[in-house]
């Protein structure tokens, strides 16, 4: 393998922002932030969904609205978004 052409493969702290679940794994992701976890400082990567919050793994259906998308949709379309097909 050539020297200097491969990304740095290192331990990275991932934080699921929907439920504050943290885990460390190895990755080549480039981050600017760092965080301390279990007494050690790691590069920090924030993620919206992990195995701790995804409905497939948790067995629970829940709305994960991190950016106000549901409210924005309801404000834009209101009662028109009832799912009923309009008669022609």
From Swiss-Prot:
GO BP: any one term:
translation
Q: Which UniProt keywords apply?
A: Ribonucleoprotein, Ribosomal protein
Q: Name one Pfam family in it.
A: Ribosomal_L31
Please give the InterPro entries that the UniProt record associates with this protein.
Answer: Ribosomal_bL28/bL31-like_sf, Ribosomal_bL31, Ribosomal_bL31_B, Ribosomal_bL31_sf
> Got a GO cellular component term for this one?
ribosome
Instruction: State a single Gene Ontology molecular function.
Output: structural constituent of ribosome
Among PROSITE patterns, the record links this protein to: RIBOSOMAL_L31 (PS01143)
Query: Would I find Ribosomal protein among this entry's keywords?
Result: yes
Assembly, in brief, is:
Part of the 50S ribosomal subunit.
Which family, according to UniProt?
Belongs to the bacterial ribosomal protein bL31 family. Type B subfamily.
Against NCBIfam families, the record matches this protein to:
L31 (TIGR00105), PRK01678.1 (NF002462)
Could you identify this protein by its name? Large ribosomal subunit protein bL31B
Species classification: Bacteria, Pseudomonadati, Pseudomonadota, Betaproteobacteria, Burkholderiales
Q: Which gene encodes it?
A: rpmE2
